[in-house]
């Protein structure tokens, strides 16, 4: 791909087009989704066209998923670039020219509310990706993820109730991002594999 990149650089320079390069592991789909999301958000004041035909299938899926996740952005248009011809032999450039561009519809992908993502981030970044509900309750209140309206003598109980209803329950039952395990007198919150995958590109 290096020769093609150099050619693109030269063409952009001729046309006085600003070019920025971003690098990602081409086999890491979640890392790629996050990177595409960040680029789109950084360019939110511009019209954004996403070519899903250039690159591997993993890259195409990552680009399309990033567009679907950013459902609130109305200035994104993913498209498929249909080439004029295809290579006759393996080992050569796979396609040539541009016959047409086909706009692709964006279907919405549901994502958790921001407070749930903030809570998931606490678990994901915590030591060994687990912590007690008591620790989580304190951190959630300190970070404004939950609010507690109670007198001092009822504060701890009200904090647990708010954490359970607004954070723990949806993350466990609706999203499957965390699990609760009782060990001794403590209840431990641990992140699931699905939660780890989601954290890779949502937080």
Range-by-range predicted roles:
Residues 55-58:
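Polyanion-engaging groove/track-forming segments
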Residues 1-47, 61-203:
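Long, low-complexity, Lys/Arg-enriched
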Residues 47-53:
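Short glycine-rich phosphate-binding loop at a beta-alpha junction
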């Amino acid at each position: 791909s290096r020769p093609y990149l150099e050619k693109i650089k030269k063409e952009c320079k001729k046309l006085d087009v600003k070019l920025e390069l971003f690098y990602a592991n081409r086999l890491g789909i979640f890392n790629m989704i996050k990177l595409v999301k960040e680029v789109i958000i950084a360019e939110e004041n511009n019209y954004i066209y996403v070519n899903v035909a250039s690159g591997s299938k993993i890259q195409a899926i990552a680009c399309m998923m990033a567009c679907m996740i950013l459902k609130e952005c109305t200035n994104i248009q993913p498209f498929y670039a249909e080439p004029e011809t295809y290579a006759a032999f393996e080992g050569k450039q796979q396609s040539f020219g541009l016959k047409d561009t086909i706009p692709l519809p964006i279907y919405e992908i549901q994502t958790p509310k921001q407070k749930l993502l903030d809570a998931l981030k606490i678990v994901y970044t915590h030591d060994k990706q687990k912590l007690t509900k008591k620790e989580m309750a304190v951190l959630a209140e300190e970070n404004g993820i939950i609010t507690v309206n109670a007198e001092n003598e009822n504060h701890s109980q009200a904090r647990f109730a708010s954490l359970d209803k607004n954070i723990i329950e949806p993350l466990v039952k609706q999203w499957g991002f965390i699990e609760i395990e009782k060990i001794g007198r403590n209840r431990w919150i641990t992140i699931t594999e699905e939660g780890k995958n989601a954290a890779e590109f949502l937080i």
